[in-house]
Amino acid sequence: MPVIKLKGINVDFPFTPYPCQEDYMSKVIECLQKKVNGVLESPTGTGKTLCLLCSTLAWRDHFKDTISARKITERMGGAELFADRPMSSWGTAATDGDTPTYYTDIPKIIYASRTHSQLTQVVNELKNTSYRPKICVLGSREQLCINQEVMRHESNHIKVHMCRAKVSSRSCIFYNNVDEKSTDKEIVNSILDVEDLVKTGKKQRVCPYYLSRSLKQHADVIFMPYNYLLDPKSRRAHNIELKGAVVIFDEAHNVEKMCEESTSFDLTPHDLISAIEAVDRLLREQASDISKADSAEDFNVESLNSGLKMDITTIAKVKQILMDLETAINDFEMPANNQGITKPGSFIFELFEMANVNSKTKTETVEAMEQITGYLAGRPGVFLNTSGLQKVADIIQLVFVAEPAEGSKKSQTGNSLKEFKVHIHPDNSNFKKKQITDVWASSSTKKQGNVLSYWCFSPGFSMQELLRQEVRCIILTSGTLSPLSSFTCEMQIPFPVSLENPHVIQRDQIFVSIIEKGPDGVQLSTAFDRRFVPENMSSMGNTLVNLSRVVPHGLLVFFPSYPVMDKTLEFWRAKGHADRIENVKPMFVEPRGKGTFTEVIDGYYGKVDDPNSSGGSFFAVCRGKASEGLDFADTYGRGVVITGLPFPPRMDPRVVLKMQYLDEMCRNKISGVKYLTGQEWYRQQASRAVNQAIGRVIRHREDYGAIFLCDHRFKSADARNQLPSWVRPYVKIYDGFGTMVRDVAQFFRTAQKTRPVPVKKGKAEGHENQADTRLLNTGSSCLTKSVWPSDIYQKAKTLDAHVPSLKRRKLDSEEHSGREGAARLCIQYEMEMTSKRKPVSLLDALDDTTDKEEREDTMVGEERASHLSTLSLQHDKRLDDESRGGKRKIKVVQERETVTSHTAKTGKAFMMELRRCLSHENFKLIMEALQSYKTADNLNNLLATVAEPLIQDHNTHSLLRGLYQFIRPHHKKEYDERCLELTGEGCGYKQEHSLSREEKEALRHNSVKAEIPPVNPPIEQLNSSRLLNQGGSHLGTIQLNGGEVNVRSEEQKPQTSIKEGPSCSSLLSDIKQAIGAEKTRQMFSALQAYKTSNNYEQMVSTVVSLLTERDEDIALLERLSVLIRPQHRKQFGELLKSLTGNDSAVVQDSDIGSSQQLSYLEERLNARYRPSFHECC
């Protein structure tokens, strides 16, 4: 490996670095040597992670050599150990004036990133270097525990208490082996990520969680998610020592948000009620046991249950605290506008004082709550929700985290809480409070509860806390930190070292365009007053239709928010824009839930990889999962469209208070401290979200792509200045849409000719965990190559379950049977099922009165997303199941068989998920309730039984909604309403769900009778100008007995040459009919100018913009080719090819010269529209 010398440090690097990489490593070393903080931005694909690791570890080795040289010098009495290498050259890293003396002075490196998947990628990069430090990766029990008795529980806090109980009693065989295995050299000297730790733990029968904590003591580099550092409770729980450590935050664009959220909370009425109920249940049991005692002499409270070491009075005190806290919160009268009440941060202590919780009582209160939680969590029998009680205990610790045991009033209300606000507002959730008959069980069951919010508005609060721990330095780095000035202001700590690195790509690899107006001339905007205007949404749809034609392979489209995306897609479906996009690039929509994300993204990847497809389009939101961590390298992201500026919700109380806080800080103007104004922060939030979405494309040095900013507000200098520094030089604003289309088509033609084709990995090689690996931030080395997935088409069927209105027309015509099944699977939204099968599982049998078609129809909208999320159909598991054959095998032959096969599996898959998520007792309880419902047909009894175990934990709400598929038709509406009351979300009920199977059959039979039979052979109706596998409409309009039968409207077959003069008359008539008189006048003015000036560029930009607003007008553009002069025809033909994707769209020489055609056309115009050609139309 090459050795590069930077600032006196020899850095081993895997290859010769680029100048931008050397600059980056120099800045890192400068921070380490001078003990100063740094903020470093380097675009994805520039090898940021590799540079960070190599420079940091090289400096650490040099630091260690400094100590070695000093010790040897002392022993040698000043003599040189090697004549040709003076000891002064061994290590002179201490340029900060310090002279390290002991090896214990060597700083630990704490490397934090947002998620474990990103940390896994970093660890894999470390394996590619020559450095072999001792490392450990810290994770939660959720990721690392291998004890099945603990992992079978639903809630994370229950797993924590179960684990602690087993550890304290030494009943966990895996924990008992930790001491022995933690010194194993094979483990200590290996570089293990989370997955490797789990594999090692299972193989060696040692607990990975406690093994990682043991390895931490002697590790040189400690990897962890950055909430472990920023959350004081987590930092204390993991015993993270920060003094003298180097702290690195990778992917730091989220640090600002995490800093605020780690010290904030929202306490809802539901949390308090569930906490009171849990303590009340225990109190009743203990009181009952006392009453059963034979005599007072024989009574011993602790002997009632050896697991609970507290008396009944302590339990009663805890309950009283909870009730007093609930009363204190709910006693506030809300203002008429229902906006809530805001208090200073110090008010939180007054509020808790009302419940007798203060700095003196906090410790015993928290210990009592955690002991109760631990006891209830480990108790066998019916599950009792203790999440609310655990949350209250965590909140008390958070509020009093900085308070000493004997804290004074002054310390509580001092200047340190200026960053916090207390906000009390009505609970507007759909959670319906359960009525409690015991008057002592809740103090406010008759009134709507209030939510207590305690919000931090300064990320600098957490950053300053890290500095108080005496860290050596803090380095923040990411691919998108721009604008840097506002970012550093928010952190409120000094950053003497900063860097905005350029990209390693060349000019011909990036195309950036600000699109102010759509092809129809309507200004594009997602401002609050414009976002849902029909003309605006239509223009945006037309823009995307055109871009989908010229951008090859994968196209990414980002919306400002989910509501904007949902309403826009609904409009496009109703008006036909979505169908036109589908014809070129099948649409895949980012789901809100986590469960189906892998399914949808795999479908998108598979469609892009399909050699018979023109690619796919992926619709997502800024700040969503796809915009944050997904890799769309190479063909998966050739273009990214930003449909607007994603400003935060302006009237949200937290946003309003944040802006007020910043404005207040600016007015007070503390010397030496710079604050953003509220408006600057508001704009920065939108800019940073845009920059993060832009970063999804151009992921390595050979990648290329286009960025389209589709909002007129991007034209402002302020908006452009907040774009990443590597993007700003290439931004171009176009006056005409047609000119932009021409340039981007030329850009991709050039790039495809000059850039190497991405290396596609084989099916076996690139198949495993493809979706998970793309969640990692690949491209950390500029040698990154894309990983191509295998074709996984059947998963894409769920892509639009998340937008209720997006349901594609049923493809039940015989003409579709010859179409490629895989392509149809990717674009289908809804399908009719016709094959009848016997019930294949118990749950199928329970609802034998409802056929499988109804099951598919009942799961619509958000409910289908929730249902699928419970199936946990991870990529590997699906592959394994399908490879076994039998009834689980999906044979992609024709659509009906595939859908039937999938639906037959849903009952069994749901049953498996129910069994996996619930305890054995609760699963058995629900199955008995379903059997009873089958025989008694009593919905109330069913709900009374199944609701209790399924509504306690938010994670199991989707299971309650998932049972909707087994509810009989006459109960579906009521069940949907009850689910809405209990979980805040319905099941997607539609009126047709209440129809019985017989009623549905009758409706279907009547609709079949009403259908018009084909009047001509199918071959006569097919339009050969569009490939059938592109998913578009393809049947034309036919005449029958003088009347018109509209089968499926479609444009005429394009003509490539016009040999007769009179054809110009027909062309003129067709154009005027298609685009109207005004636009026809504009077009022929441009053609007349072309005839006289021979200015092809000016003519084509006008003509293309006018004739690409609708799909059917493309044929007219092709017919205009006869008017193009010979020297321009090749160029015009390439433009047509890029717009249509049709190789046959080649401009032929006509028998009549183009000048003659233009003259003839002018004559026709003069004859029809007097007085002159220029005043035509």
Curated annotation (Swiss-Prot):
The record's Pfam families line, in alphabetical order, gives: ARCH_RTEL1 (PF23109), DEAD_2 (PF06733), Helicase_C_2 (PF13307), HHD_RTEL1 (PF23116)
Gene Ontology terms for molecular function: 4 iron, 4 sulfur cluster binding; ATP binding; ATP hydrolysis activity; DNA binding; DNA helicase activity; DNA polymerase binding; metal ion binding
Q: Which residues bind ATP?
A: S42, P43, T44, G45, T46, G47, K48, T49
- The record places the motif (DEAH box) at 250-253
Listed EC numbers: 5.6.2.-
Q: Name its GO BP terms in alphabetical order.
A: DNA recombination; DNA repair; DNA replication; negative regulation of DNA recombination; negative regulation of t-circle formation; regulation of double-strand break repair via homologous recombination; telomeric loop disassembly
Family matches, as InterPro entries: ATP-dep_Helicase_C, DinG/Rad3-like, Helic_SF1/SF2_ATP-bd_DinG/Rad3, Helicase-like_DEXD_c2, Helicase_ATP-bd, HHD_RTEL1, P-loop_NTPase, RAD3-like_helicase_DEAD
Q: What superkingdom does the record give?
A: Eukaryota
**What are the Basic and acidic residues biased-composition ranges?**
852-866
Q: Which residues bind [4Fe-4S] cluster?
A: C145, C163, C172, C207
Q: Which reaction does it catalyse?
A: ATP + H2O = ADP + phosphate + H(+)
Q: Where is the protein situated, by its record's location annotation?
A: Nucleus
At which positions is motif Nuclear localization signal?
151-167, 883-889
* Keyword line: 4Fe-4S, ATP-binding, DNA damage, DNA repair, DNA-binding, Helicase, Hydrolase, Iron, Iron-sulfur, Isomerase, Metal-binding, Nucleotide-binding, Nucleus
The answer to whether UniProt assigns keyword Cell inner membrane to this entry is no
Annotated segments matching region Disordered: 847-869
| GO CC term, one of those recorded | nucleus
UniProt domain Helicase ATP-binding: residue ranges: 7-302
Of which family is this protein a member? Belongs to the helicase family. RAD3/XPD subfamily.
Which purpose does this protein serve, as stated in its record?
Answer: A probable ATP-dependent DNA helicase implicated in telomere-length regulation, DNA repair and the maintenance of genomic stability. Acts as an anti-recombinase to counteract toxic recombination and limit crossover during meiosis. Regulates meiotic recombination and crossover homeostasis by physically dissociating strand invasion events and thereby promotes noncrossover repair by meiotic synthesis dependent strand annealing (SDSA) as well as disassembly of D loop recombination intermediates.
| HAMAP family in UniProt | RTEL1
Name the UniProt record assigns to this protein: Regulator of telomere elongation helicase 1
Q: Which gene encodes it?
A: rtel1
